[in-house]
């Protein structure tokens, strides 16, 4: 069975209550359930993890080598973490970077990501729909064995 990872970084455990005008009112658990539902239709396993600790995110990712795809919302670590970037490169799992808010319409320091240039794609500003679109893309990617141009 194919496996997709859903990895969420710092403060995303507060979704639903933290700045809902920016991040919406959907909780992380609800997002995880929605993503898992998209994947399960295609008999793809969804493994989820969230931590506020960069080291825990890296350690968990190291244990997931061999997964078929990664959905990554690094949160604020997108703008600061060379360590998590190196871990993503090291495990050699194709991934999409996801942000609930449009980071390019926010503070200047949020405009740079250490992940965008190594991701197969990036989604920002689409709220929960961004996660679902990323999950749908992961399904297509897995079904095409990485040959995404055949479905375009």
Question: Across the structure, where does each feature detected by a protein language model lie?
Answer:
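Short, acidic/small-residue loops that bind anionic groups at enzyme active sites
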Residues: 90-106
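N-terminal small/polar loop signature for handling phosphorylated ligands or for N-terminal nucleophile
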Residues: 52-91
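Short, glycine-/small-residue-rich phosphate/pyrophosphate-handling segment
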Residues: 48, 105-152
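Short glycine-rich anion-binding loops that position phosphate/pyrophosphate groups of nucleotides
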Residues: 10-12, 75-78, 101-103
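Glycine- and acidic-residue-enriched helix-capping/strand-helix junction motifs
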Residues: 15-29
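Short beta-strand elements in bilobed, periplasmic/extracellular small-molecule ligand-binding domains
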Residues: 32, 36-49
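Extreme N-terminal starter segment of soluble prokaryotic enzymes
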Residues: 1-4
